[in-house]
């Protein structure tokens, strides 16, 4: 089946800011991304999406869930997540490990190997691996089906392009594959800026998804009754 929205709230668990373990029910920002994924998959058979976002909107959570959904329910899939910092790499892998540990037994694939950076499902011949940008061989020699480039605007500038090329060249242009790029803004130059501009101009095959900060209810406060706006 392909209904990620149903799967996410039925099979995926997240840790909330209050420290509770709860089902992943898509929030407004996540639903915008979900709809963009569904639309591109329906029209092109694959996903190539770049996301310009605010912080704490749950978009890495959504992408991580989507990648786990695919590699844990399909044969011969390999997902790779690359972040800008080792702490972020560890956090995203821990999130995916939580998805796996809390997945209903009926849907949980048999695990052959699990480390601090990789989950391998031997019966499916699928796997999930994480890496930190800055190395020289990310994606080299791999065949990947799903990629998540996290905070691309903050990747180490000296190796960002090499890492990006190695990673994306490992993903064949075939139905069912997916490349997600997401980042907060970081100036008007660099690989993320160029990719975003190309997506907006319609020249590179990526769909631009801009999600404003005010869509998230947690960024809002109730206006006091005696509030008087100033000219500023």
Residue ranges of model-derived segments:
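Phosphate/NTP-binding elements of NTP-utilizing enzymes
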Residues: 1-232
């Amino acid at each position: 089946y392909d209904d990620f929205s149903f799967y996410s709230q039925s099979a995926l668990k997240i840790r909330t800011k209050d420290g509770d373990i709860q089902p992943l029910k898509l929030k407004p920002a996540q639903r915008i991304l979900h709809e963009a994924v569904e639309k591109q998959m329906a029209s092109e058979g694959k996903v190539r999406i770049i996301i310009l976002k605010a912080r704490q909107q749950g978009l890495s959570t959504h992408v991580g869930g989507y990648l786990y959904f695919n590699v844990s329910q399909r044969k011969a899939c390999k997902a790779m997540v690359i972040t800008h910092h080792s702490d972020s790499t560890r956090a995203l892998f821990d999130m995916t490990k939580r998805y796996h540990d809390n997945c209903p037994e009926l849907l949980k694939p048999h695990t052959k190997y699990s480390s601090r950076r990789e989950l391998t499902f031997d019966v499916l011949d699928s796997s999930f691996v994480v890496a930190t940008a800055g190395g020289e061989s990310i994606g080299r020699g791999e065949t990947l089906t799903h990629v998540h480039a996290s905070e691309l605007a903050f990747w180490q500038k000296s190796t960002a392009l090499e890492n990006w090329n190695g990673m994306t060249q490992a993903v064949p242009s075939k139905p069912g594959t997916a490349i997600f790029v997401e980042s907060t803004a970081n100036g008007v130059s660099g690989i993320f800026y160029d990719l975003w501009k190309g997506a907006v101009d319609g020249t590179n095959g990526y769909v631009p998804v801009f999600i404003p900060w005010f869509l998230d209810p947690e960024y809002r406060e109730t206006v006091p009754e005696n509030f008087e706006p100033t000219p500023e």
